[in-house]
Amino acid sequence: MAELAEQKREEYKAHAPVFHRPKDGAREVHEPYLAALVEDGDNVTLVHEAADGHVDAFLVAMLFPAPPVYDPGGSTCSVDDFVVESPELWETAGRALLERAFAATRQRGAVQSVVVCGPQDEPKRTLLRSMGHDVASEWFTLPFGQPAVT
């Protein structure tokens, strides 16, 4: 899982180099963080294995209550750590992981999902749109002290 996440960080760094700049030793810090997510029974952690047995995709879903000013009717399934080894796996492994995570979190009271996806990650965005997701919010970043790109 940590290796796949590291690959995704490198990919995302090209799009937003300050926001996604990996810290020195990021993998060593991320491994225990991922382990804690896996061990937390409140989370839904799923992996997909390739035919040779190596992990080629993973997902961690967490349940969160809505902010106090909103009432969607239940909790939110938040999916931030969600990575596949190669773009063509989004439609197969990625879809399978999301479907399982959504089923598990709906049983726990989730009424909606929020899936983090970078604007440049078109294969992942295509999967999410094909499953009925819509963009509800976006983050715009500006590194201070550096010229804005227009």
PLM region descriptions:
Residues 95, 99, 107, 119-137:
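Conserved active-site alpha-helix within GNAT-family acetyltransferase domains
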Residues 81-84, 90-103, 130:
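Conserved acetyl-CoA-binding loop-helix of GNAT-fold acetyltransferases
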Residues 9-33:
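Conserved GNAT-fold acetyl-CoA-binding loop/helix
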Residues 105-117:
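Conserved GNAT acetyl-CoA-binding A-motif
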Residues 66, 116-118, 129, 134-147:
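Conserved catalytic-core motifs of GNAT/GCN5-like acyltransferases
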Residues 47, 54-63:
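Conserved beta-strand in the GNAT
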Residues 62, 72-86, 138-141:
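Conserved acetyl-CoA binding element of GNAT-fold acetyltransferases
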Residues 31-47, 78:
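A short helix-loop-beta-strand connector motif used in the catalytic cores of GNAT acetyltransferases and
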